[in-house]
A protein has these predicted regions:
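Single conserved hydrophobic/aromatic residue that forms the stacking wall/gate
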Residues: 1-10, 14
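Structured mid-domain segments that build the active-site/substrate or prosthetic-cofactor binding neighborhood
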Residues: 12-45
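Non-catalytic C-terminal accessory modules of carbohydrate-active enzymes
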Residues: 28-36, 51-194
Length: 194
């Protein structure tokens, strides 16, 4: 997982080697995850390939596809994690809920975004689970995310606007939240390229 860390700008480094980086990311999600042997316990780490969703330090990895112009892949994987790693049940989380990170991942991603690098005021847009989410801010401001044509089938983003202006990259800043912006996301059932 350290190989895929972004804390010091790894995304920028890998932009120069985009195909190699995408290959590394893809291999993480497609590698064999079978558990074998007499002393093997059941998987509680939420494996998708070798991506362990129950291991909180890897939560940012899905959003790395946005940094290498594969936002549709981020959208697919966020959708897959919603459906395979979370349930309204006693055992509804993979891994464990230490420090609230499992829930934090779900809350932010279900609103349609995630902060890939803590402390960096940039958010990566993924796949919203809700048609509308509102964050109430001081002074009566609101940060609103509206997902149009959102459904289980429509997991891909067709277009995005922030305060009515088209977004050509799947990112926005913390200042956009604090300003009380509106992020509108048009969903579709087909992959789209930036």
């Amino acid at each position: 997982i350290r190989e895929r860390s972004v804390s010091r700008g790894l995304g920028d480094v890998y932009k120069r080697q985009e195909d190699a980086f995408v290959g590394k990311l893809d291999s993480l999600f497609t590698a064999d995850s079978s558990l074998e042997g007499e002393t093997t316990s059941s998987d509680i780490s939420g494996l998708i390939g070798q991506y362990a969703h129950g291991n909180e330090p890897s939560h940012h990895v899905i959003h790395m596809y946005n940094y290498v112009n594969r936002p549709w892949r981020t959208q697919e994987l966020v959708d897959s994690v919603y459906r395979s790693q979370y349930a309204n049940a006693v055992d509804g989380l993979s891994g464990n809920e230490d420090c609230g990170q499992m829930s934090a991942w779900y809350v932010l991603n279900s609103m349609g975004f995630y902060q890939v690098c803590p402390g960096k005021p940039v958010y990566s847009i993924g796949r919203p689970a809700f048609d509308k989410a509102v964050v109430n801010l001081p002074d009566g401001k609101k940060f609103t995310v509206i997902a149009k044509n959102n459904s289980k089938k429509n997991k891909y983003i067709k277009s995005m606007t922030l305060n009515g202006k088209p977004l050509d990259k799947p990112f926005f800043t913390h200042d956009d939240i604090i300003a009380g912006s509106t992020l509108e996301i048009e969903m579709t059932d087909r992959r789209t390229q930036p």
